[in-house]
Amino acid sequence: MARRSVLYFILLNALINKGQACFCDHYAWTQWTSCSKTCNSGTQSRHRQIVVDKYYQENFCEQICSKQETRECNWQRCPINCLLGDFGPWSDCDPCVEKQSKVRSVLRPSQFGGQPCTEPLVAFQPCIPSKLCKIEEADCKNKFRCDSGRCIARKLECNGENDCGDNSDERDCGRTKAVCTRKYNPIPSVQLMGNGFHFLAGEPRGEVLDNSFTGGICKTVKSSRTSNPYRVPANLENVGFEVQTAEDDLKTDFYKDLTSLGHNENQQGSFSSQGGSSFSVPIFYSSKRSENINHNSAFKQAIQASHKKDSSFIRIHKVMKVLNFTTKAKDLHLSDVFLKALNHLPLEYNSALYSRIFDDFGTHYFTSGSLGGVYDLLYQFSSEELKNSGLTEEEAKHCVRIETKKRVLFVKKTKVEHRCTTNKLSEKHEGSFIQGAEKSISLIRGGRSEYAAALAWEKGSSGLEEKTFSEWLESVKENPAVIDFELAPIVDLVRNIPCAVTKRNNLRKALQEYAAKFDPCQCAPCPNNGRPTLSGTECLCVCQSGTYGENCEKQSPDYKSNAVDGHWGCWSSWSTCDATYKRSRTRECNNPVPQRGGKRCEGEKRQEEDCTFSIMENNGQPCINDDEEMKEVDLPEIEADSGCPQPVPPENGFIRNEKQLYSVGEDVEISCLTGFETVGYQYFRCLPDGTWRQGDVECQRRECIKPVVQEVLTITPFQRLYRIGESIELTCPKGFVVAGPSRYTCQGNSWTPPISNSLTCEKDTLTKLRGHCQLGQKQSGSECICMSPEEDCSHHSEDLCVFDTDSNDYFTSPACKFLAEKCLNNQQLHFLHIGSCQDGHQLEWGLERTRLSSNSTKKESCGYDTCYDWEKCSASTSKCVCLLPPQCFKGGNQLYCVKMGSSTSEKTLNICEVGTIRCANRKMEILHPGKCLA
């Protein structure tokens, strides 16, 4: 053995001496340079201090040692400070509330640790109105009017109960008749069922339904916990008491990251109103189908905890119900405070005043649900420690459930699994798997706050006392929360008040604007595919599994993905109403765009809705009450002994002097809608037999409607209607070209050529192929060579009108093919104009210009074209622009004898002057080349 070791040492020493290598650290590094950026990933470098000495040369240090190193630095994102816009002008003084307001918007939320916005966004001030308030008192008809203006049934007057809310229905009553034979207590916490709910904040708001109102009906319900029944309010359809505390309904969920815990911001839910209409709002609330904490403080706390390390989460929750309830579908009694707020809304739309309704009362109300409590904890675990524990996700969930049953609920005969106490994570904490968690976030709802706080787990705590959970459970019965609920829009409650229809429409408009303020589209993209979420005026980053850090900028060692999922940018403003009386808005999947295999945005890219407009003179918002909201319906037919019923007008036409019945011999006039014109005889005459004498008449379109194209395309000029002969140009973003013709002309009632619905943009391969070369050339290594018309021009390029001097004919050619052939010294091809060849002045001038060009002394390349003596090249458009005659040079060899206009005299002009006059389309006859003889 010793001999073998000596032999090994001798061989090793011989090898080292034979191939000596450079010890690079013999030459020290300089200090790292300053970072090139203070944030957003800069670079810094250092250099090796080389001394070219004998050692350096003999040991091949030049080949072995690296001389410079570079590394990333300051990779944290630059802070984005919150930015507010300027206040707009004061609104008009509203005559109904005698207030005016001014608003400003959040131009940019804070992000990545930037300064937050703390200043108010709305300012109000009292004012003296110059107009009269159009809001009239509600007509109670045969009902009793309360002092507050509320209308209630006559039978509720003098019944010993405060049905008006201001006790005006019990004033000056002689004798009262009680509704119930005895007094009943209200259902405990019944007022919670009448609260509004803010779907964006995920929390209850002010009272919208008055659940102390019983409507003169003595309806009771009994609980198994008490001997005395409770009085059921008029707003509730039914109530059922129950207490659910089953031990086997403890549920656990595993989350690799928080993105799946909060709802996707693109999800939409449609809420139908009682009036039959519906509108869509984002779902950010908890219901029977979804549990979401996206916008409350607990979710923010969870996000901040996940920033500290790569984390996974286990959520354990249990629902305890005290009672279930269902709200009536109609005839709901509003709370006094909500009714007063609605009555004080102005008639004219004011975004600031209408938005306050949602701040104070939420956006929805409860249509059904339960009162009770939810035991709900979210445990944060280190992803690395969970992985090293050896447990699967299902096993980890099971261990949390078992330990909660034993140490929180104190369920007897709980069998503890061996793997839950002997895994690597539990062994560090005396057999407790939960003690291995980094943190817990309490999502507990219901019960007394001190008992709920006692249930929250803290790292290193000794555990709960046996009575803690049972004390909280008992307190839930007295202090419940609304859980497992369903919602309807608060706008549906705005009924049976003065100007109800007008105010409902204003609230719907305000809700759309209000919801847009909570859209995370305003946030900048988060690093490592994090999902941005907007909390107030601050953007937070929800980290994907395998990432962490204040802004998700750090990666765990096993994080390999570099995909970037797409997120929606913000919606554009609504377009103006087009000829079909619709308007639209769009958004782009560009915040960021999907990259490296990332997911595309889900949801609609374009929204369209009908326009609302008035056919009468605009004198401000009309006061429309519920009973005045009429729609156009077919009027009942009127029977008469003589005359003619209303005739049917042609498509896209209407009767100017419209009525139900016309006398014998009376004429009606047919008119056409905007954009159409009458063709034929436009008068009908009523005959004695009750029929109409009418000739052929129709409404033909005399304008083209703005075409519907893909959102990526831009239409220039952008108009609602285009007259016959007008053209549009379709363009794409930089780096893309239209995958088809780009120029279209309105001819008759349609576009020529027809515009395909599938027309879109494609990558500008021509520009990419060209590189830094001239038009018609492509880059081949460091050289520029001519493109091949056959190989390089298979993709679409715009049409050009081209003249071939060999065949003495003109034709339409793709731009790529024309440029390639021109580059290959095909001099017989001449550019005439952009677009397909069509008869007209543009083609005539192009042909004449080509004939003149043969004598031009100047030939300057300019885009597709070549500029001649009478032209200059525009740097901004790459097109030839004609000079004015005074700008031409004097004299020259190329002279012409011409006659100007109707003049009989002859005049000698040079080629530049001739070209400028013909370019201006002025009349001129060329008599012969050369000077005039006389």
From Swiss-Prot:
Ranges for the LDL-receptor class A domain? Answer: 138-175
Annotated region (CCP 1), positions in chain: 611-688
Q: Where in the numbering of this chain does the MACPF domain appear?
A: 176-522
Taken from the UniProt record, the cysteine pairs bridged by disulfide bonds within this chain are: C22-C61, C24-C65, C35-C73, C39-C78, C82-C117, C93-C127, C96-C133, C140-C151, C146-C164, C158-C173, C180-C218, C399-C420, C499-C623, C521-C570, C523-C539, C526-C541, C543-C552, C577-C611, C589-C601, C644-C686, C672-C699, C704-C746, C732-C761, C773-C823, C784-C801, C786-C837, C793-C816, C862-C873, C867-C919, C880-C897, C882-C932, C888-C912
Describe the PTM.
All cysteine residues are assumed to be cross-linked to one another. Individual modules containing an even number of conserved cysteine residues are supposed to have disulfide linkages only within the same module.
Domain annotation TSP type-1: ranges = 22-79, 81-134, 565-612
Region: Factor I module (FIM) 2; residue ranges are: 858-934
The similarity annotation says: Belongs to the complement C6/C7/C8/C9 family.
Please give the name of this protein: Complement component C6
Q: Which organism is it from?
A: Pan troglodytes
What's the encoding gene here? C6
